[in-house]
Amino acid sequence: MASTYLTRTPSSTGNRKTWTFSAWFKKFETGVQHRILSVQESGDERLGLYFSTSDQMVAELRFGGVGGTGLTTNQLFRDTSGWYHVVWSVDTTQATASDRAKLYINGEQITSFSASGYPAQNANTATNYTVEHRIGKSVGFNNPFNGLMSHIHLTDGTTYDATAFGEYDANGVWKIKTSPTFTPGSNGFTILKDGNTITDQSTNSNDFSLGSGTLTKTEDNASNLFATWNSLSPTASNFTLSNGNTKVYRSGTVNPGQAIYGQTIMPTTGKWYVEAKIVEQP
């Protein structure tokens, strides 16, 4: 989605105090800022969910156009081969400050932060307001998301934890619920549930539009994992990855010892094979 983002502006105001955002994603780069969700009000970015240049996840809320409150994880997220699941649950009506914003990653609530701040009780956030909501790029800045996204949900008026959208399998691995049960509310939505569909697939009709670029459907998704090339492993420059790191192109002359390596689904025992299509790049 590096050159692509999605946009929607609600036609009416929903619940700005209580909401939940859930998304599955795979990032392709480290050391750069990736915007997952961005909402802008009155010329200022007032809400952002993103990775910092240090690969920490930041869930930021801004009020009054100056400063802000937010959660910045201690954890660093540098895996470019696996799918992540994030849930951001906000309810500013709660009496306890730490209950007003909660962050879940791969099923676990994050409670240790390098920086933390919580909104005032009953504060109105920008979410579910009649301003632009972007997925995959900042409203106020650039910072595009370079990676894949799948099964994106927003609720209006209801909070959920991660178990509404995922569950642990018999091996203790967090996996997706492809048809989660939740109440979307008036401005809630479900998009990118089946491939690259940005038509709302909840009980509403809160469709998104393509802000720029082209959406590309990939077979690698949160419910159908594919082996991908390792974006961190090229032994020479000029390797260009695309289509969810399932396609690689090398420009110029390839010398002995120059390569890029696969990263996922590489068994060390048993019988297996690799299938690839080799084409001449014009």
Which ranges hold each PLM region?
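Short surface loop/edge beta-strand patches of beta-sandwich-type extracellular domains
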Residues: 1-18, 69-78, 138-141, 176-182, ...
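Extracellular glycan-interaction patches encoded by glycine-rich segments
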Residues: 125-149
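Beta-strand-rich, repetitive solenoid scaffolds
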Residues: 7-9, 38-40, 47-52, 58-62, ...
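Extracellular glycan-recognition modules
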Residues: 3-58, 94-97, 158-163, 266-268, ...
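Conserved, ordered domain cores of eukaryotic regulatory proteins
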Residues: 223-282
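Extended recognition patches within non-cytosolic domains
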Residues: 1-5, 95-97, 102, 111-117, ...
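Short hydrophobic/aromatic patches on beta-strands that form ligand-binding or substrate-lining surfaces
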Residues: 21-27, 86-88, 135, 149-154, ...
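Extracellular glycan-interaction surfaces
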Residues: 1-3, 22-30, 48-121
